[in-house]
Amino acid sequence: KINEPTDGKILVNGEDITHLSGQKLKKFRKNIQLIFQDPYASLNPRMTVGEIIREPMVIHHIYQTRKEQDDRVAELLKIVGLKPDHVRRYPHEFSGGQRQRISIARTLALNPEFIVCDEPISALDVSIQAQIINLLKNIQKELGIAYLFIAHDLSMVKHISDRVAVLYLGTLVELTTSEELYANPQHPYTRALLSAIPIPDPKIEQERDAKKIRLEGEVPSPINSPAGCKFQGRCKCAMPICRQE
């Protein structure tokens, strides 16, 4: 761990994993993996694709022989849409989308139950983003993996999510199904976010411009936020109780 949490708990399947350490933490990490935001910085430039994907297997002692590991690497490359002969190439020889496919293959190496996707498409060209999202959806359907998908692109969130949590300055303000959130948002911040999603039709966009919810006021400091609801200073629906809870 880099830092210990100062407050709160992290529960996974009802188990408190906030302060796990040693072998218990290592076992937990095997089941939960992470896809990083930047495919250019998250791959070791000195390692080949095969070495990058194989590394988690070596760390966690997966498979008994090198041949078994190599076969698994080839299988993972096929799953993410890359060729088996890419194993001997280095990250700089690939495009951003291909690098993110390599990252996804590495993430799948340990057969995790849960994957945290930390804005996995925000650093990619728009033309590639949909391909990566569809790849993630196909993998989820075939392997039954759960995702925690962190994103600010609400159109993509709608496309991939079953449940959506909306956060403002680190505080959960709304949690519901994807269908319910987009059809009937409850929190003023959620409504403002959804009203800001552009529509690729100038006429419709012009008509709905007057209905857009424009947030006013300054964003409070995350380290010195006001008492009560953190959104109160920018919310037109704020009441006295919002300053308390």
Give the positions of each predicted feature.
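ABC ATPase NBD coupling module
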Residues: E4, I17-Q33, I59, E180-P185, ...
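Conserved ABC transporter NBD signature motif
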Residues: G8-D16
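Conserved ABC ATPase "signature" region
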Residues: E15-D16, V58, K67-D85, L194-S195
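Conserved ABC ATPase signature
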Residues: Y90-F94, Q98
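P-loop NTP-binding/switch modules centered on Walker-like glycine-rich loops
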Residues: V116, P120-L124, I128-E207
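Short catalytic/signature loops enriched in Gly
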Residues: T177-E245
